[in-house]
């Protein structure tokens, strides 16, 4: 029982579905402890960009530590939500948005200084743009696009690759980026498949009795 509670607290156990407070149509509830963590993460992004782009060659321990702290904040706001029970619709929207902003910020730095293969970075950016389009389409047709588990895991190898590339020139960073890219494309395929099934069900005429 204690082990099950620990898994749920750590975020490993996500059985039971998302909390009802995070669902579409619920109030945003901006003033919560988890959302405050997200606000700090967002506020640190321009600081990271200034430090990283002003580093000279992109390899700067201060920039790497900032990137790590912003990335780790994703775990912190989730833990805060589970400890306090302060779930919110805004938090459900803000968390993936902050993660995407962090990935794109890291991609800009790595592209500028050529720390990682640019073709892979370009694919990542193209994927994020595709997800923005899919999210907009989903909003228009009433589909609530939920993050799948592959998508949750995909972001970590990418962030690790960016973090490591800002510290040292190593093949490990490139390999981690490729792993994250493969998972990211897999997650994207799942999103589009879900969207296709939703549209099929939406356009299917209801049978009359």
Predicted segments with their positions:
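Membrane-interface transmembrane helices that cradle and orient dolichyl/undecaprenyl
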Residues: 51-59
